[in-house]
Amino acid sequence: MKETVANHVYQVISDELPPEEWDLAALNAELLPIVPLNKIVLTDAEKSSGKVDDLVARLQEETVALYEQKEKEFEDFDLREIERIILLKVIDRKWMDHIDDMDQLREGIGLQAYGQRDPVVEYRMAGFEMFNDMTKAIQEETTGALFHVQVEQK
């Protein structure tokens, strides 16, 4: 969860910009559907420090606190089992998608030879990038599902 928060913040906000120019609207649009935090605004300390790391640390703390609150809602249930089930389902779905994507890549990689590039190297590089994208998507989807899971009693 902490890594998901950090990835989104660093993707949207640059340390090179002053805090007044940070795109908090984009950060809210990226992060809030995954982690249901309150609307993200800068504190005075974050404005004065100008460090993205301070914002990341605060958002990570809020995320952990929010998840601990979620754990209290599930006292009667085995939350670790729910986490395991969600993670396995997400991994299974993303892995199957990844296998399909790799098959499509293999079918189309021959065109790289026309561009004077080694198809094996291009396949390896594209496959590595696709695998990294898959692992990031697994983290995001699992985090989002854990925060939005609800147990209905019959």
Q: Where do the protein language model's features map onto the residues?
A:
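Extended, charged helical/alpha-beta scaffold domains that provide interaction surfaces
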Residues: 1-154
